[in-house]
Protein backbone atom coordinates (compact mmCIF):
# COMPACT_ATOMS: atom_id res chain seq x y z
CA UNK A 1 0.00 0.00 0.00
CA UNK A 2 1.03 3.65 -0.49
CA UNK A 3 1.41 5.18 2.95
CA UNK A 4 0.08 8.61 3.90
CA UNK A 5 2.60 11.06 5.41
CA UNK A 6 1.20 10.61 8.94
CA UNK A 7 1.26 6.83 8.60
CA UNK A 8 4.83 6.86 7.32
CA UNK A 9 5.94 9.17 10.15
CA UNK A 10 4.39 6.87 12.74
CA UNK A 11 6.43 3.94 11.36
CA UNK A 12 3.96 1.30 12.61
CA UNK A 13 5.14 -2.11 13.73
CA UNK A 14 2.89 -5.15 14.06
CA UNK A 15 3.62 -7.46 16.99
CA UNK A 16 2.07 -10.91 17.38
CA UNK A 17 2.34 -12.38 20.89
CA UNK A 18 2.46 -16.18 20.99
CA UNK A 19 2.91 -18.84 23.66
CA UNK A 20 2.57 -22.61 23.65
CA UNK A 21 0.43 -22.84 26.79
CA UNK A 22 -3.24 -22.98 25.82
CA UNK A 23 -5.91 -24.60 27.95
CA UNK A 24 -8.14 -25.76 25.11
CA UNK A 25 -5.56 -26.23 22.33
CA UNK A 26 -2.04 -26.88 23.67
CA UNK A 27 0.78 -25.94 21.30
CA UNK A 28 -1.60 -23.76 19.30
CA UNK A 29 1.03 -21.53 17.61
CA UNK A 30 2.60 -24.53 15.90
CA UNK A 31 -0.68 -26.19 14.88
CA UNK A 32 -0.40 -27.31 11.27
CA UNK A 33 -2.47 -25.49 8.64
CA UNK A 34 -1.65 -26.92 5.21
CA UNK A 35 1.96 -27.62 6.14
CA UNK A 36 2.52 -24.23 7.76
CA UNK A 37 2.48 -23.46 11.52
CA UNK A 38 -0.46 -21.28 12.51
CA UNK A 39 1.81 -18.52 13.83
CA UNK A 40 3.44 -18.31 10.39
CA UNK A 41 0.00 -18.06 8.75
CA UNK A 42 -0.80 -15.12 11.05
CA UNK A 43 2.59 -13.54 10.30
CA UNK A 44 1.86 -13.82 6.56
CA UNK A 45 -1.52 -12.09 6.93
CA UNK A 46 0.11 -9.27 8.90
CA UNK A 47 2.87 -8.88 6.31
CA UNK A 48 0.19 -8.53 3.62
CA UNK A 49 -1.05 -5.36 5.36
CA UNK A 50 2.17 -3.69 4.18
CA UNK A 51 2.31 -1.07 6.92
CA UNK A 52 5.70 -1.94 8.40
CA UNK A 53 7.73 -4.72 9.99
CA UNK A 54 5.99 -7.66 11.63
CA UNK A 55 7.49 -9.12 14.78
CA UNK A 56 6.47 -12.28 16.65
CA UNK A 57 6.84 -11.98 20.43
CA UNK A 58 7.51 -15.61 21.33
CA UNK A 59 7.31 -17.07 24.82
CA UNK A 60 9.19 -20.20 23.71
CA UNK A 61 12.13 -20.79 21.42
CA UNK A 62 10.31 -23.29 19.20
CA UNK A 63 7.88 -20.55 18.15
CA UNK A 64 10.73 -18.17 17.35
CA UNK A 65 12.52 -20.86 15.35
CA UNK A 66 9.39 -21.59 13.26
CA UNK A 67 8.96 -17.91 12.42
CA UNK A 68 12.61 -17.40 11.54
CA UNK A 69 12.59 -20.51 9.35
CA UNK A 70 9.80 -18.85 7.34
CA UNK A 71 11.85 -15.67 6.95
CA UNK A 72 10.20 -13.68 9.72
CA UNK A 73 11.41 -11.68 12.71
CA UNK A 74 10.90 -13.09 16.20
CA UNK A 75 11.97 -11.96 19.66
CA UNK A 76 12.12 -14.35 22.60
CA UNK A 77 10.28 -12.93 25.62
CA UNK A 78 9.93 -13.88 29.27
CA UNK A 79 7.56 -16.89 29.40
CA UNK A 80 6.09 -15.72 32.72
CA UNK A 81 4.77 -12.34 31.58
CA UNK A 82 1.20 -11.74 32.83
CA UNK A 83 -0.44 -10.82 29.51
CA UNK A 84 -0.09 -10.54 25.76
CA UNK A 85 0.21 -6.76 26.09
CA UNK A 86 3.23 -7.16 28.36
CA UNK A 87 4.73 -9.59 25.84
CA UNK A 88 4.20 -7.12 22.99
CA UNK A 89 5.79 -4.30 24.99
CA UNK A 90 8.84 -6.34 25.96
CA UNK A 91 9.36 -7.47 22.36
CA UNK A 92 9.12 -3.93 20.97
CA UNK A 93 11.53 -2.56 23.56
CA UNK A 94 14.05 -5.28 22.73
CA UNK A 95 13.63 -5.03 18.95
CA UNK A 96 13.50 -1.22 18.75
CA UNK A 97 15.21 0.31 21.80
CA UNK A 98 15.68 3.60 19.93
CA UNK A 99 11.90 4.09 19.74
CA UNK A 100 11.66 4.55 15.97
CA UNK A 101 8.27 2.84 15.78
CA UNK A 102 5.65 5.19 17.26
CA UNK A 103 2.60 2.97 16.67
CA UNK A 104 2.40 -0.64 17.84
CA UNK A 105 -0.29 -2.99 16.53
CA UNK A 106 -1.14 -5.97 18.74
CA UNK A 107 -2.45 -8.85 16.60
CA UNK A 108 -3.48 -12.06 18.34
CA UNK A 109 -1.52 -15.12 17.29
CA UNK A 110 -4.60 -17.26 16.68
CA UNK A 111 -6.07 -15.39 13.69
CA UNK A 112 -4.75 -17.31 10.66
CA UNK A 113 -7.56 -16.09 8.38
CA UNK A 114 -7.24 -12.42 9.37
CA UNK A 115 -8.10 -9.85 6.69
CA UNK A 116 -4.95 -7.65 6.46
CA UNK A 117 -7.21 -4.66 5.85
CA UNK A 118 -8.27 -4.78 9.50
CA UNK A 119 -4.72 -3.97 10.56
CA UNK A 120 -4.65 -0.99 8.21
CA UNK A 121 -8.00 0.22 9.55
CA UNK A 122 -6.81 0.06 13.15
CA UNK A 123 -3.66 2.07 12.37
CA UNK A 124 -5.56 4.72 10.39
CA UNK A 125 -8.00 5.05 13.30
CA UNK A 126 -5.42 5.58 16.05
CA UNK A 127 -3.82 8.32 13.93
CA UNK A 128 -7.13 10.03 13.08
CA UNK A 129 -7.05 12.45 16.04
CA UNK A 130 -4.18 13.39 18.37
CA UNK A 131 -6.01 12.52 21.60
CA UNK A 132 -6.80 8.93 20.54
CA UNK A 133 -4.57 6.77 22.73
CA UNK A 134 -5.37 3.44 21.11
CA UNK A 135 -7.79 2.00 18.60
CA UNK A 136 -9.66 -1.24 18.22
CA UNK A 137 -12.32 -2.77 15.98
CA UNK A 138 -16.01 -3.61 16.30
CA UNK A 139 -18.58 -5.41 14.16
CA UNK A 140 -22.36 -5.22 14.49
CA UNK A 141 -23.85 -8.37 16.00
CA UNK A 142 -26.36 -10.07 13.71
CA UNK A 143 -26.71 -13.47 15.40
CA UNK A 144 -29.04 -13.32 18.39
CA UNK A 145 -27.12 -15.92 20.39
CA UNK A 146 -24.03 -13.69 20.36
CA UNK A 147 -25.84 -10.93 22.24
CA UNK A 148 -26.12 -13.04 25.39
CA UNK A 149 -22.93 -15.11 25.00
CA UNK A 150 -20.42 -13.98 27.67
CA UNK A 151 -17.56 -15.15 25.45
CA UNK A 152 -18.56 -12.51 22.89
CA UNK A 153 -17.34 -9.23 24.34
CA UNK A 154 -19.63 -6.29 23.65
CA UNK A 155 -18.30 -2.78 23.03
CA UNK A 156 -20.47 0.17 24.02
CA UNK A 157 -20.00 2.77 21.27
CA UNK A 158 -22.59 5.43 20.47
CA UNK A 159 -22.45 5.42 16.68
CA UNK A 160 -24.98 7.62 14.91
CA UNK A 161 -26.37 6.64 11.51
CA UNK A 162 -23.55 6.60 8.97
CA UNK A 163 -20.71 6.88 11.47
CA UNK A 164 -17.90 4.38 11.02
CA UNK A 165 -15.92 5.04 14.19
CA UNK A 166 -16.52 6.37 17.68
CA UNK A 167 -15.24 6.51 21.23
CA UNK A 168 -15.54 3.27 23.18
CA UNK A 169 -17.30 3.99 26.46
CA UNK A 170 -17.24 0.48 27.95
CA UNK A 171 -16.63 -3.20 27.22
CA UNK A 172 -18.59 -6.01 28.83
CA UNK A 173 -19.47 -9.68 28.63
CA UNK A 174 -23.05 -8.65 29.44
CA UNK A 175 -25.63 -7.60 26.84
CA UNK A 176 -25.09 -3.85 26.84
CA UNK A 177 -26.40 -1.29 26.23
CA UNK A 178 -30.03 -1.94 27.19
CA UNK A 179 -32.87 -0.98 24.86
CA UNK A 180 -33.45 -1.11 21.10
CA UNK A 181 -30.49 -0.60 18.82
CA UNK A 182 -27.34 -2.36 17.67
CA UNK A 183 -24.86 -4.28 19.78
CA UNK A 184 -21.22 -4.47 18.75
CA UNK A 185 -18.91 -7.47 18.88
CA UNK A 186 -15.47 -6.35 20.05
CA UNK A 187 -12.54 -7.62 17.97
CA UNK A 188 -9.40 -7.88 20.10
CA UNK A 189 -6.97 -6.20 17.71
CA UNK A 190 -5.38 -2.97 18.94
CA UNK A 191 -3.22 -0.18 17.55
CA UNK A 192 -1.46 1.72 20.34
CA UNK A 193 0.54 4.87 20.34
CA UNK A 194 3.80 3.53 21.73
CA UNK A 195 3.72 5.91 24.69
CA UNK A 196 0.22 4.63 25.51
CA UNK A 197 1.33 1.00 25.49
CA UNK A 198 4.26 1.77 27.79
CA UNK A 199 1.96 3.56 30.23
CA UNK A 200 -0.68 0.82 29.98
CA UNK A 201 1.61 -2.07 30.95
CA UNK A 202 3.02 -0.07 33.89
CA UNK A 203 -0.43 0.31 35.46
CA UNK A 204 -1.96 -2.24 37.86
CA UNK A 205 -5.11 -4.11 36.80
CA UNK A 206 -8.22 -2.09 37.58
CA UNK A 207 -11.33 -3.00 39.57
CA UNK A 208 -13.54 -3.34 36.47
CA UNK A 209 -10.79 -5.13 34.53
CA UNK A 210 -10.59 -7.79 37.24
CA UNK A 211 -14.36 -8.06 37.50
CA UNK A 212 -15.05 -8.46 33.76
CA UNK A 213 -11.71 -10.16 33.03
CA UNK A 214 -11.16 -7.69 30.18
CA UNK A 215 -7.73 -6.08 29.99
CA UNK A 216 -8.86 -3.15 27.83
CA UNK A 217 -10.91 -1.78 30.73
CA UNK A 218 -7.61 -0.79 32.37
CA UNK A 219 -7.23 1.83 29.66
CA UNK A 220 -10.72 3.22 30.22
CA UNK A 221 -10.30 3.21 34.00
CA UNK A 222 -7.22 5.37 33.49
CA UNK A 223 -8.96 7.84 31.15
CA UNK A 224 -7.28 6.69 27.93
CA UNK A 225 -9.37 7.32 24.83
CA UNK A 226 -10.10 4.15 22.86
CA UNK A 227 -11.48 4.76 19.37
CA UNK A 228 -13.43 1.85 17.87
CA UNK A 229 -13.68 1.46 14.09
CA UNK A 230 -16.66 -0.34 12.60
CA UNK A 231 -15.81 -3.20 10.24
CA UNK A 232 -17.97 -5.79 8.52
CA UNK A 233 -16.19 -9.01 9.46
CA UNK A 234 -15.06 -10.78 12.63
CA UNK A 235 -11.90 -12.84 12.10
CA UNK A 236 -11.95 -16.48 13.15
CA UNK A 237 -10.11 -16.98 16.42
CA UNK A 238 -8.73 -20.51 16.78
CA UNK A 239 -9.40 -21.69 20.34
CA UNK A 240 -10.48 -25.31 19.81
CA UNK A 241 -9.79 -28.27 17.52
CA UNK A 242 -13.06 -27.45 15.74
CA UNK A 243 -11.90 -23.88 15.10
CA UNK A 244 -8.65 -25.26 13.70
CA UNK A 245 -10.57 -27.40 11.21
CA UNK A 246 -12.60 -24.35 10.14
CA UNK A 247 -9.39 -22.38 9.58
CA UNK A 248 -7.96 -25.22 7.48
CA UNK A 249 -11.12 -25.23 5.37
CA UNK A 250 -11.04 -21.45 4.88
CA UNK A 251 -7.39 -21.50 3.83
CA UNK A 252 -7.67 -24.70 1.78
From Swiss-Prot:
Its main location: cytoplasm. The keyword Transferase applies. GO terms for biological process: CMP-keto-3-deoxy-D-manno-octulosonic acid biosynthetic process; lipopolysaccharide biosynthetic process. GO terms for cellular component: cytosol. The keyword Transcription regulation does not apply. GO terms for molecular function: 3-deoxy-manno-octulosonate cytidylyltransferase activity. Keywords: Cytoplasm, Lipopolysaccharide biosynthesis, Nucleotidyltransferase, Transferase. Its EC number is 2.7.7.38. InterPro entries: Cytidylyl_trans (IPR003329), KdsB (IPR004528), Nucleotide-diphossugar_trans (IPR029044). Activates KDO (a required 8-carbon sugar) for incorporation into bacterial lipopolysaccharide in Gram-negative bacteria. This is 3-deoxy-manno-octulosonate cytidylyltransferase. It comes from Rhodospirillum rubrum (strain ATCC 11170 / ATH 1.1.1 / DSM 467 / LMG 4362 / NCIMB 8255 / S1). The lineage of its organism: Bacteria, Pseudomonadati, Pseudomonadota, Alphaproteobacteria, Rhodospirillales. The gene is kdsB.
Amino acid sequence: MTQSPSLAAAAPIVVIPARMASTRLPGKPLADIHGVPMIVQVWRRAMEAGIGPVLVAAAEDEIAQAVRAAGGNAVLTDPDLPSGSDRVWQAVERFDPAGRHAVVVNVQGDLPTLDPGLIIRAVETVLAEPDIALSTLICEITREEERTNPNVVKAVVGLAEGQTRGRALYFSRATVPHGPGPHYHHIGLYAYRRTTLGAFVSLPPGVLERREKLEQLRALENHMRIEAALVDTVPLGVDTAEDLERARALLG
